[in-house]
A protein has these predicted regions:
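Two-component/phosphorelay signaling modules centered on CheY-like receiver
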Residues: 24-44
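Acidic catalytic/metal-coordinating carboxylates
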Residues: 48, 74-80
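Active-site residues of response regulator receiver
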Residues: 66-67
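The feature encodes the CheY-like receiver
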Residues: 71, 89
Length: 145
């Protein structure tokens, strides 16, 4: 497994990047295609923690979509490491798994997303998680005092 791939749809000019961290490439491709089709966001998929840390520093994504159970380091460990770095601190995150440690997600402000996933719920969760980001980017918000 190469550790990362980017869809052709993600190569067109888009507004911002969602970093998907998922070791099951079938799920990664499914999420990437759905997000590319249903949102204005570019997506990049990586399959493990080291690639996630590297790509997050390079891309400065607007959102992290993290699988909880990953080889080597879990999604929470990735999130915590990114929060320790100034350039990636504060990136909102959605954590995916069949079994999530809700008591650890809540204090971090991480949104829970249970597998198996309904793509409609995934898109709604992304929209909700990115509402503050979109509000800041909106030209109208520059005029709000």
């Amino acid at each position: 497994m190469s550790g990362q791939f980017t869809s052709q749809a993600a190569q067109r000019p888009r507004s911002a990047t969602i970093l998907i961290v998922e070791d099951d490439m079938d799920i990664g491709v499914f999420l990437q295609q759905a997000i590319d089709e249903e949102t204005p966001y570019q997506t990049t998929v990586v399959s493990d923690g080291p690639h996630a840390l590297e790509k997050a520093q390079q891309l400065h994504p607007c959102l992290l979509l993290l699988d909880y159970r990953l080889p080597g380091m879990n999604g929470l460990e990735i999130y915590d490491r990114l929060q320790q770095m100034e350039e990636t601190r504060g990136i909102p995150a959605i954590m995916m798994s069949a079994h999530l440690p809700i008591e650890e997600l809540k204090p971090r402000g991480i949104y829970p997303l249970y597998k198996p996933m309904d793509i409609g719920n995934v898109i709604r969760m992304i929209t909700h998680a990115l509402a503050p980001f979109e509000q800041k980017r909106s030209p109208e918000s520059a005029w709000i005092v």
